[in-house]
Curated annotation (Swiss-Prot):
The keyword rRNA processing does not apply. This is Maleylacetoacetate isomerase. GO terms for molecular function: glutathione transferase activity; identical protein binding; maleylacetoacetate isomerase activity; protein homodimerization activity. It comes from the Eukaryota. Homodimer. It comes from Rattus norvegicus. Glutathione is required for the MAAI activity.
Length: 216
């Protein structure tokens, strides 16, 4: 690997990994990917080698500037502080708080309830309804918030950290067959985001570890 080049430990379908891939693309940061398959061999995140990088045994993890950072929002905050152009957090403190609120609603209030480790615990037959309930509950709140904050994107007309979190979560909703018709604001924003190059190149269907049958 090229010395000094950031290295992202990622799984193609991980929405948390996708958040980081979007941010890296938006900020024009060249990086390398090390795929961590969360299914194969019982989950490569449980290997001793990976646990030395991230004791939480989760992706993403980003090696950058001589440190390794786990947790996607911590990574996004670090990238924003060290490479602030283009901005993902507005300068206005109130708008910045709203962006962080939406990001945290998704990253803490929705995604963890339907991630792989939780779904394994609820049993195969309960996974779909469990995930649907978790996402629907969160989207009910998110839709109401976005109705008052959105412009073209989640908070006004500039892409922010909230958008970086939104698109991957909508992809999860689609994968779990959530009816998105009650969420026109979410759907409208997501459509606009997926038209952007940074969201396309970082998409799960275009990653080095994407299975051939899922590539587009």
């Amino acid at each position: 690997m090229q010395a000094g080049k950031p290295v992202l430990y990622s799984y193609f379908r991980s929405s948390c990994s996708w958040r980081v891939r979007i941010a890296l693309a938006l900020k024009g940061i060249d990086y390398e990917i090390v795929p961590i398959n969360l299914i194969k061999d019982g989950g490569q995140q449980f290997s001793e080698e990976f646990q030395t990088l991230n004791p939480m045994k989760q992706v993403p993890a980003l090696k950058i500037d001589g440190i390794t950072i786990g947790q996607s929002l911590a990574i996004l905050e670090y990238l924003e502080e060290t490479r602030p152009i283009p901005r993902l957090l507005p300068q206005d403190p109130q708008k910045r708080a709203i962006v962080r609120m939406i990001s945290d609603l998704i990253a803490s209030g929705i995604q963890p309830l339907q991630n792989l480790s939780v779904l394994k615990q609820v049993g195969q037959e309960n996974q779909m309804p469990w995930a649907q309930k978790a996402i629907t509950s969160g989207f009910n709140a998110l839709e109401k918030i976005l109705q008052s904050t959105a412009g073209k994107y989640c908070v006004g007309d500039e892409v922010s950290m909230a958008d970086v979190c939104l698109a991957p979560q909508v992809a999860n909703a689609e994968r779990f067959k959530v009816d998105l018709s009650p969420y026109p604001t979410i759907s409208h924003i997501n459509k606009a985001l997926l038209a952007l190059e940074a969201f396309q190149v970082s998409h799960p269907c275009r990653q080095p570890d994407t299975p051939a049958e899922l590539r587009t």
